[in-house]
Amino acid sequence: MAANPRAAAVAALVRQEQDGFSNLVLDAELKRQQLEGRDKAFASAIFYTVLEHRGTLDYILCQFLPKGLAKLDAPVREILRAALAQARYMQVPVSAAVNEAVKLTRAFKKSSASGLVNAVLRKACSYDLSTASFKNEVERLMVLGSAGQDVAEFLHKNYPDEALDILTYKADGGMTSLRANPLKTSAEELCTKLLASGAKEAKRGIVPGSVLARFEGSPAENELFRQGYFHVEGQASQLAALCVDAQPGETVIDLCAAPGGKTILLAEQMHSTGRLYSCDAAENRVGLIRTAVQRMGLANVEALCNDATKVNPALPQADRILADVPCSGLGILAKKPDLRYKKLEPAREAELLATQSAILDTAAQLLKAGGRLVYSTCTIDPAENQQQIAAFLARHPEFTVVEPAAALPAGMTAGEHGALSVPTRTGMDGFFLCAMQKNGEKLQ
């Protein structure tokens, strides 16, 4: 099959439905088909548009498929989704979307389905979703918000008035969040440099030092990225690192650090002095940290493979610790659309909560008296956030919740057990952080 962005997107979608890990399967397919430039961007746009809107796409397609989508061969199913996504969300003319879809049935050796694809798409592309009726609010969220049943039920239970807006929120306004390297430039100067180097748009973000930019392709293809003028990091993640308030000359540990964005910010706060231990449990992800640190020219970072659920004797007592723990990811549905369809199984949730709890206990042992611990997640699940902190404080009365070192954006307020960002309230990712101090003389 000749290199074709639509074919690449469909092939990646087939793999994603089988294996998950959306970014990995897409990257592998783009490399296999050797797509570059606009073709690569177009294939990526189709892929992520389908994932983001799959619930809506499937609902519409099923209006014209009496036996449903599940009975179709996987390539045919993804061809239908991809074509409808192009026509409905990507400003591709209906005729082009349909004709190319029919061609793809032949390319994937499914030519017997070409008539069905043609007929279903011509009806589906003109379907008026406003005429749809739903059994209940959860089904409405699943269709209009493109979510699986578990995620829809979670949002309906915990955020009933904001659920649909959370599902349809565009992360950072659809722009890419960056962090300027203060060793080379300021956020204001970076905006100017980005526009001069081909970015379509660049402006200051909500979090101090952050920049929001829109690129033609990947930010990693920009020369300023290769030269270490910025790294890609969500605004909420930047805020967590800022709240650590790392100081020059200190000993700091980033317990769950890969791919390294928060480590970079911590090292910059320390003016590349002191010692910063950047840890991850997977050796291949530690390699990502080392690559990021080298690109930014930071000299005070030691990246190491480490299980954060256990105390490693090789790690010293630290002045400050950041524990950005593994979580359900329910705050970043806009950035990782495959999470919309995840199963929220009680056994897995219990295992995740136990892991978070163990990491907090490790941090408690590694932190010096008077030191600061920042716990953060990219979820809006109270069990992983406020309830996790309440349980930690009950186990560790030597800790006290303190005011975050960085100013919180509008809409994000600190409570008894931490501060929560809900996308609809802050314009950032869904996110939680809690700054705590260990009893003893406060760090200066």
What function would you assign to each model-found segment?
Residues M1-Q444:
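S-adenosylmethionine
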